[in-house]
Structures are given as structure tokens and as C-alpha cells.
């Protein structure tokens, strides 16, 4: 199992993008932890967060399938682009990862952002 550093990643992101950071969630096979959530987006209830984490677990579980189908090497990050946020799911292994949500404009203003996040999180 890979060593993951979600708090280190959250600290890096707060320093790098400030208020553009919306949330950081760490998950493994059995549980999850909301590492950071910006105050103005802290309106998800427990059931909604459970649903999000269930989706993250499914995404992590599909990592090996995606790697086999595409044959590009290891899948390190999945990115979802929404109107108001861009979510990045840094996949450590089959059921472990860190999900980060940023304001869309914040994400678009960064360069080589995913590579930096992978390194800071210990996933590169």
C-alpha cells in the first residue's frame, strides 16, 4: 500500500491556491476523512459525503481496469470538470486516494499543477 500524505497536500494547496481550494478528502478501504473544507462550501451533510466517497472508492477500484485497457502505465489522477469546481482524485492504489476540489478558475490559472500535487501527496 502506498504512503499517502493528505494533510501535507492540503497545506500545500492552501499555500498555493488560497481560497481557491474547496475541499480535500482522504479515503481508504474502510473509512474516509474530510481533511479540509472551505467554510462557504461546507453544506454537504453526512449522507452526501458518504455518496461522494462511495464514488471515489469505485473510481479507485477501477484503476487497474483503466490501466489495463489503456496501457499508458499507472493511473495517478482522475479529473472531473464541473461548472463551479474541478475535482482531482489522486489514486494511490485500488481503494485509497485523496480527492481535491478547486474552484474552476483557480485550477485553470495553475501550471504543472497535477504533477506538483502528486509529488506533495507522496503519490509520484
List each model region and its residues.
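Non-catalytic interaction/Regulatory regions outside core domains
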Residues: 1-124
Amino acid at each position: 500500500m502506498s504512503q499517502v500524505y493528505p494533510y501535507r497536500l492540503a497545506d500545500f494547496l492552501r499555500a498555493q491556491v488560497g481560497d481557491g481550494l474547496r475541499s480535500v478528502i482522504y479515503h481508504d478501504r474502510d473509512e474516509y476523512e474530510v481533511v479540509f473544507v472551505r467554510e462557504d462550501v461546507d453544506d454537504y451533510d453526512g449522507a452526501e459525503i458518504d455518496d461522494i466517497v462511495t464514488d471515489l472508492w469505485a473510481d479507485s477500484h477501477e484503476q487497474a481496469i483503466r490501466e489495463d485497457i489503456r496501457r499508458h502505465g499507472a493511473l495517478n489522477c482522475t479529473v472531473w470538470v464541473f461548472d463551479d469546481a474541478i475535482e482531482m482524485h489522486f489514486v494511490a492504489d485500488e481503494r485509497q486516494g485523496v480527492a481535491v476540489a478547486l474552484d474552476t478558475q483557480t485550477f485553470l490559472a495553475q501550471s504543472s499543477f497535477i504533477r506538483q500535487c502528486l509529488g506533495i501527496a507522496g503519490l509520484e
